[in-house]
């Protein structure tokens, strides 16, 4: 990926009111995107958002910019990111735009684009939009200005799509499920999907007020969900993040089930049903227990760089259909084109129902290795700690001791002057000691 001024790996994101998340920038972004996308023929754009209060301001700015370029916008209202990808495909729109900062606090927001097929925009299109941003805004003739409209029952359309990914011969009758929607975009979607499939549903995190998205709820903070599952004696809990592209689950004992375990369950069930094509893709941070559990099943496993974009790229490279991050991004290309928390959760529920097993028991075939992460701050410009001979020597010694029953990963943060030291193995005390030993070597540089 070439150097970008605005676009990162997941669109454009920042604090509202600070560049680039300002009304004037977003208006120009809408215009620039409109100018580029208009070259492809269709002049229809789908715009969705999560529940942040700033979404109203930003969607108005986007719509004005698109209209000035001659493109019409159809609004979904609050809608999960994967729903916008789905609606973009079904409406044959030229692009879908999501206004969201995913799992971030309410004071952040962002803009990301989907192409006509529901995947992220190609690099060359993003680069063309950035080039257009350098030009002065012009307006098409009045007769060619874009219009704005609202999609009738966008939520209902997506609810039916989600239900369609659950096997027709199964139902959720008899299951008690707590669902936490993070006061985000799935608040009016996920509870209805589960209820219509037969589950008894207790919903939390379903009262968005514009400023409480992801606040002590959702996939990044499952404590409220764990407590409610235990209090209600529920069969399981499902936590989604603010824009619905992540899922973390909780079993009936209150234990957290992360993206690695979710992918293990889905991949194993796919193998049992004869529907698994190829292997599974994780990331550099995926637990070694996942890799070993899949190996025991004969399922190939590959690691991508951290980020759902890179997981998708690796899937496309391999021709495989399932990938995930331990943070809860689960990509099921047989079902969707992007990470979808509701759809991934439904596949786990299907495995529970089909096998008459609890979530706890479905996870029992995978032993999670203790994984210790230590962040070490370093002075930028003082040399690369990863190239230091002392650091290399300590790391090599730890790797030799762990052998094939553990793993060491050192990487730089992409946003701060930090070295992230990750060590995993079978013995937590040993792993912790090794992580701090390597961290001390990094600090000494």
From Swiss-Prot:
Parts of the chain that traverse the membrane: none
Top EC class of this enzyme: isomerase
Disulphides: none
GO MF annotation: an example: magnesium ion binding
PROSITE patterns: PGM_PMM
Keyword Isomerase annotated: yes
E.C. number: 5.4.2.10
InterPro entries for the chain: A-D-PHexomutase_a/b/a-I, A-D-PHexomutase_a/b/a-I/II/III, A-D-PHexomutase_a/b/a-II, A-D-PHexomutase_a/b/a-III, A-D-PHexomutase_C, A-D-PHexomutase_C_sf, A-D-PHexomutase_CS, Alpha-D-phosphohexomutase_SF
Keywords attached to this entry: Isomerase, Magnesium, Metal-binding, Phosphoprotein
Record's cofactor remark: Binds 1 Mg(2+) ion per subunit.
Active site residues according to the UniProt entry: 102
Pfam families xrefs: PGM_PMM_I, PGM_PMM_II, PGM_PMM_III, PGM_PMM_IV
Binding locations of Mg(2+): 102, 241, 243, 245
One BP term from GO: peptidoglycan biosynthetic process
Chemical reaction(s) catalysed: alpha-D-glucosamine 1-phosphate = D-glucosamine 6-phosphate
Positions of modified residues (Phosphoserine): 102
Family classification: Belongs to the phosphohexose mutase family.
Summary of the function given for this chain in its UniProt record: Catalyzes the conversion of glucosamine-6-phosphate to glucosamine-1-phosphate.
NCBIfam families (UniProt xref): glmM, PRK10887.1
Name listed for the protein in its UniProt record: Phosphoglucosamine mutase
Organism, as annotated: Salmonella arizonae (strain ATCC BAA-731 / CDC346-86 / RSK2980)
Gene that this sequence comes from: glmM
């Amino acid at each position: 990926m070439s150097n970008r001024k605005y676009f990162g790996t997941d669109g454009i994101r920042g604090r509202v009111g600070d560049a680039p998340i300002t009304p004037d920038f977003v208006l120009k972004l809408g215009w620039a995107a409109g100018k580029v996308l208009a070259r492809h023929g269709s002049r229809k754009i789908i715009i969705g958002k999560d529940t942040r209060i700033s979404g109203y301001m930003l969607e108005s700015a986007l719509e004005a910019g698109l209209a000035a370029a001659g493109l019409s916008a159809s609004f979904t209202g609050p809608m999960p990111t994967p729903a916008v990808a789905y609606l973009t495909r079904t409406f044959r729109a030229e692009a879908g735009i999501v206004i969201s900062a995913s799992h971030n606090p309410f004071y952040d927001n962002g803009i990301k684009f989907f192409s006509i097929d529901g995947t992220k925009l190609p690099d060359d299109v993003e680069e063309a939009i950035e080039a257009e941003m350098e030009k002065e805004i012009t307006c098409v003739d009045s007769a060619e200005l874009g219009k704005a409209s609202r999609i009738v029952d966008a939520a209902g359309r997506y609810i039916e799509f989600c239900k369609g990914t659950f096997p027709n011969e199964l139902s959720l009758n008899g299951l008690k499920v707590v669902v936490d929607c993070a006061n985000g975009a799935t608040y009016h979607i996920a509870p209805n999907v589960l209820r219509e499939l037969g589950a008894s549903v207790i919903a939390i995190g379903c009262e968005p007020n514009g400023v409480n998205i992801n606040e002590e709820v959702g996939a990044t903070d499952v404590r409220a969900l764990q407590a409610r599952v235990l209090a209600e004696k529920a069969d399981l809990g499902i936590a989604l993040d603010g824009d619905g592209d992540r899922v973390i689950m909780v079993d009936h004992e209150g234990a957290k089930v992360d993206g690695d375990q979710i992918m293990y369950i889905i991949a194993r069930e796919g193998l049992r049903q004869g529907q698994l094509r190829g292997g599974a893709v994780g990331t550099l941070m995926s637990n070694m227990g996942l890799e070993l559990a899949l190996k025991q099943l004969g399922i190939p496993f590959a690691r991508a760089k951290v980020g759902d974009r890179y997981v998708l790229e690796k899937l496309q490279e391999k021709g495989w259909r399932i990938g995930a991050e331990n943070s809860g991004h689960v990509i099921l290309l047989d079902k969707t084109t992007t990470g979808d928390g509701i759809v991934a959760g439904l596949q786990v529920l299907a495995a529970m129902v089909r096998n008459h097993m609890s979530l706890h028991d479905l996870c029992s075939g995978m032993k999670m290795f203790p994984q210790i992460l230590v962040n070490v701050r370093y002075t930028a410009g003082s040399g690369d700690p990863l190239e230091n001979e002392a650091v290399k020597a300590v790391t090599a010694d730890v790797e030799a001791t762990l052998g094939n029953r553990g793993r060491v990963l050192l990487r730089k943060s992409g946003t701060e002057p930090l070295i992230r030291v990750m060590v995993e193995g079978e013995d937590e005390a040993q792993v912790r000691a090794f992580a701090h030993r390597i961290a001390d070597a990094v600090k000494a540089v």
